[in-house]
Regions:
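Beta1/beta-strand and adjacent pyrophosphate-binding region of the FAD-binding site
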Residues: 1-13
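Glycine-rich flavin
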Residues: 2-4, 22, 26-28, 34-113
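Hydrophobic alpha-helical segments that mediate membrane insertion or helix-helix packing
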Residues: 9, 20-23
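N-terminal Rossmann-fold NAD(P) dinucleotide-binding loop
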Residues: 16-17
């Protein structure tokens, strides 16, 4: 592998992966340094996206418990299933990280770990 690059981006978070993709689209030989196995940085892997997914599920559960009855929707036996919530969160993260991986491959960006 030729280790000469026009652009080396440090980090594959929201700014990093966009920078790497755009650089490659402009014809620059691009690499992205990311210490994690998966692309997307903190936001996608353990920060913003996972927490928003769990928060959304929790808010829907709360509305179902507290507000649906006011609308004539009975939810007497509603219960929270944390393993399913976590699975949904993990699927969301996986889908998005795979999307970034696809864009890196499509644009011939080298992922340096």
């Amino acid at each position: 592998m030729n280790n000469n690059f026009d652009v080396i981006v440090v980090g594959s978070g929201p700014g990093g992966y966009v920078c790497a993709i755009r650089s490659a689209q402009l014809g620059l030989k691009t690499a992205c340094v990311e210490t994690r196995k998966t692309l997307g940085g903190t936001c996608l892997n353990i920060g913003c996206i996972p927490s928003k997914s769990l928060l959304n599920s929790s808010e829907i559960y709360h509305k179902a418990q507290k507000e649906f009855n006011n609308l004539g929707i009975e939810t007497n036996n509603i219960k929270l299933n944390l393993p399913k919530m976590m699975s949904n969160k993990n699927k969301s993260v996986l889908t998005l990280t795979k999307g970034i991986e696809f864009l890196f491959k499509k644009n011939k960006i080298i992922h340096l770990k």
